[in-house]
């Protein structure tokens, strides 16, 4: 039995029910699935599993604005309203949440990793609704556990921050996940392939820039680079990064976008990547056929305005699933 795991029992769609797939919405199509069901066997074809990670413990430790614990429900509510375009050949299963208010951050990350591995064993592509960006390490661990030690797994992070902070004194938090991935790779004598899109210089100290400069395998584009380059040059840079790689894990921190587009985040951003450009870049990553799982993190509903941020996060999920279904 999976620890800290609670299957879904609540529908987030409250509109009319229509049996016609031409007019169906996500909330009408999504089906509940219990990962603890021992009778389940691997699914055939391309299907997705949606799981919430109800934790912002890492945000609290990192002195951010707490509230991301509420985001899985907020994102589900927005996603449920969107039209369904994929017919009956693709399924999105809502498998529930990882939740443990009295559990440690490390325990919850471990529980998420076990749930992710279970999804992968069932041939379901994981979609994780964070939660703080501590979500990423649990997601990454689960993906790695589903692979052999020699298998590659590149990481693309759309984020204003590197999240490569040391954690030897403070312990893990929402800003250390990718350093933990890096350290795991070093321990396993693997190259950590990591590409960050949207870095803001005023959000990252010189230690982090120096660490990146000395670390083979880590690349980044600043928000200003992205503004100047346009999506075609960005996509070519991503292609170069993914050359020779078979798998990529994608994580989207909603603080990559300005407060005008994403007011409800743990750490607000004055500057930020244009969401329309982001959609084009995300679609390109999905079209590579290498995307094995993704998450959206750091939505903080108590700080949101008219669900702008939750809706934007749901929009990214919509477009990623559309393209992944066509190229997996």
Swiss-Prot record:
InterPro entries (UniProt xref): HutG, Ureohydrolase, Ureohydrolase_dom_sf
Catalytic reaction list: N-formimidoyl-L-glutamate + H2O = formamide + L-glutamate
SUPFAM superfamilies, per database record: Arginase/deacetylase
GO molecular function terms attached to this record: agmatinase activity; formimidoylglutamase activity; manganese ion binding
EC number: 3.5.3.8
Record-listed Mn(2+) 2 binding positions: 159, 161, 253, 255
Gene3D superfamilies: Ureohydrolase domain
Keywords: Histidine metabolism, Hydrolase, Manganese, Metal-binding
Pathways involved: Amino-acid degradation; L-histidine degradation into L-glutamate; L-glutamate from N-formimidoyl-L-glutamate (hydrolase route): step 1/1
Pfam family, one: Arginase
Cofactor note: Binds 2 manganese ions per subunit.
Annotated positions binding Mn(2+) 1: 133, 159, 163, 253
The keyword ATP-binding is annotated on this UniProt entry: no
Keyword NADP: no
GO annotation (BP), single: L-histidine catabolic process to glutamate and formate
Known cofactor(s): Mn(2+)
Record family assignment: Belongs to the arginase family.
Function: Catalyzes the conversion of N-formimidoyl-L-glutamate to L-glutamate and formamide.
PANTHER family: ARGINASE/AGMATINASE (PTHR11358), FORMIMIDOYLGLUTAMASE (PTHR11358:SF35)
NCBIfam families: hutG (TIGR01227), PRK13775.1 (NF010347)
Protein name: Formimidoylglutamase
Organism: Streptococcus pyogenes serotype M6 (strain ATCC BAA-946 / MGAS10394)
């Amino acid at each position: 039995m999976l620890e800290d795991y609670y299957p879904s029992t609540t529908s987030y769609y409250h509109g009319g029910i229509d049996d016609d797939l031409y007019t169906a919405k996500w909330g009408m199509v999504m089906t509940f699935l219990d990962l603890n069901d021992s009778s389940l066997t691997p699914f055939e074809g391309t299907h997705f599993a949606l799981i919430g990670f109800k934790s912002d413990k890492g945000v609290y430790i990192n002195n951010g604005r707490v509230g991301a614990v509420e985001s899985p429900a907020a994102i589900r509510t927005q996603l449920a309203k969107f039209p369904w375009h994929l017919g009956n050949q693709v399924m999105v299963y809502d498998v529930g949440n990882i939740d443990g208010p009295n559990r440690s951050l490390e325990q919850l990350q471990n529980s998420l990793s076990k749930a992710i591995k279970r999804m992968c064993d069932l041939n379901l592509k994981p979609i994780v609704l964070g939660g703080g960006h501590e979500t990423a390490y649990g997601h990454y661990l689960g993906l790695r556990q589903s692979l052999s030690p020699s298998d590659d797994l590149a990481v693309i992070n759309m984020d204003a921050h590197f999240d490569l902070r040391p954690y030897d004194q403070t312990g893990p938090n929402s800003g250390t996940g990718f350093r933990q991935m890096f350290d795991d790779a070093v321990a396993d004598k693997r190259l950590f392939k990591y590409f960050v899109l949207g870095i803001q210089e005023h959000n990252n100290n010189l230690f982090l820039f120096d660490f990146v400069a000395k670390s083979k395998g880590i690349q980044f584009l600043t928000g200003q680079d992205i503004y100047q380059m346009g999506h075609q040059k960005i996509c070519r840079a991503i292609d170069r990064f993914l050359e020779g790689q078979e798998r990529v894990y994608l994580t989207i921190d909603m603080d990559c976008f300005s407060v005008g587009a994403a007011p409800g985040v743990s750490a607000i951003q004055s500057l930020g990547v244009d969401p329309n450009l982001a959609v084009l870049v995300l679609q390109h990553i999905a079209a590579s056929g290498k995307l094995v799982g993704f998450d959206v993190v750091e939505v903080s509903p108590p700080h949101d305005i008219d669900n702008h941020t939750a809706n934007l996060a749901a929009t990214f999920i919509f477009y990623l699933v559309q393209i992944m279904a066509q190229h997996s």
